[in-house]
A protein has these predicted regions:
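Short loop/hinge segments at the start of secondary-structure elements
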Residues: 257
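A mid-sequence, solvent-exposed acidic-amphipathic segment
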Residues: 194-237
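Hydrophilic extracytoplasmic domains
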Residues: 261-294
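Transmembrane beta-barrel domains of Gram-negative outer membranes and organellar outer membranes
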Residues: 30-159, 165, 172-188, 222-243, ...
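Cleavable N-terminal export/targeting peptides
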Residues: 1-41, 293-294
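Hydrophobic, aromatic-enriched interface-forming segments
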Residues: 168-211
Length: 294
């Protein structure tokens, strides 16, 4: 009996060692995975909204290693009975991908796999409109003039993504939280409407391998210019893990939208991986918004 238990214990130890060796060789940083496995999460603008918005888009990722990925995306934002708390969800519906290295070995190189779902709650903890109201009441303009808007966001990542064997998605849950400060400057003219500057810092955590988890801090800077029929934003950011296995991705993103009547906004976007995110992303999409808090 004791001998049998010892043999089973040895088998368990051997299995754990093999598991740890496999995952250490596999790597758990974004650099070795598909573009949507552990993506750099878009910064929040610093202001929640009273609009229900639905966004559909399609992304093409060109890897620095000549890999190709096509991904349709969905995004949804819902005010929770007030504009100060929003529920947001986004989903990489399906990755269609191929690697150029496989071209000589396979007749059909394209594969597809479902992606992960992200859900977050965004809470407005400070807003410049509140400050404007307080200015009128107190007339203490000097001390209140430069107080920014602020949003606290907490979210989760599901483990719904597949094709772990080909390193498309990590097949593990995660969560994140961040805090964004934003200042908005308005102009009184027919063409230029506003300029918003935001910065954020946060925490990102995901499960890796047999037992460990990777903890990373998130960071970002964002600028958004809005005109009558144009919206241009640029964002630099990323996150930094502690395992030094390609887990410190950084990128710069830019997006050009054209707000139209009836709440529609077509847009084009581009993302370039600066470090540990080895892709160019080209995106085209359409956003629809409607005010449901009146």
């Amino acid at each position: 009996m004791i001998k049998t238990l010892n043999i089973k214990a040895q088998h368990i130890r051997l299995s754990l060692i093999c598991c740890a060796l496999f995952f250490s060789l596999l790597g758990w940083g974004q650099i070795v995975w598909g573009p949507n496995a552990l993506p750099i999460i878009d910064m929040h603008s610093g202001e929640t909204t009273e609009d229900l918005s639905i966004e559909i888009s399609n992304s093409y990722y060109k890897g620095f290693d000549e890999s190709n990925t096509l991904t349709p995306n969905l995004r949804l934002n819902i005010p929770l009975f007030t504009r100060w708390v929003n529920l947001e969800a986004w989903y990489s519906v399906m990755d269609f991908y191929r690697h150029e290295m496989q071209d000589t070995r396979h007749e059909t190189n394209w594969h597809n796999v479902a992606g992960d779902i992200y859900v977050s709650t965004n809470i407005q903890v400070l807003h410049h409109n509140w400050i404007t109201t307080q200015k009128k009441e107190t007339q203490n303009i000097a001390s209140l003039q430069y107080i920014p808007s602020a949003v606290f966001r907490i979210g989760i990542k599901t483990a719904s993504g597949g094709d772990f064997e080909n390193q498309r998605f990590i097949d593990a849950p995660g969560y994140f939280l961040d805090f964004t400060l934003a200042e908005k400057f308005h102009w009184q003219n027919k063409w230029a409407k506003s300029l918003s500057i935001a910065s954020s810092i946060g925490f990102y955590c995901w499960q890796t391998g047999c037992a460990e988890q990777n903890d990373a801090y998130m960071y970002g800077i964002r600028a958004e210019f809005e005109a009558q029929y144009l919206r241009l934003l640029t964002e630099w950011g990323g996150y930094t893990g502690w395992q030094n296995n390609g887990d410190c991705p950084m990128s710069i993103k830019t997006r050009l939208g054209m707000p139209c009547p009836l709440g529609f906004e077509p847009y084009v976007a581009y993302q370039y991986g600066i470090h540990d995110w080895q892709y160019h992303e080209f995106r085209i999409g359409l956003k629809y918004s409607i005010d449901i808090i009146k």
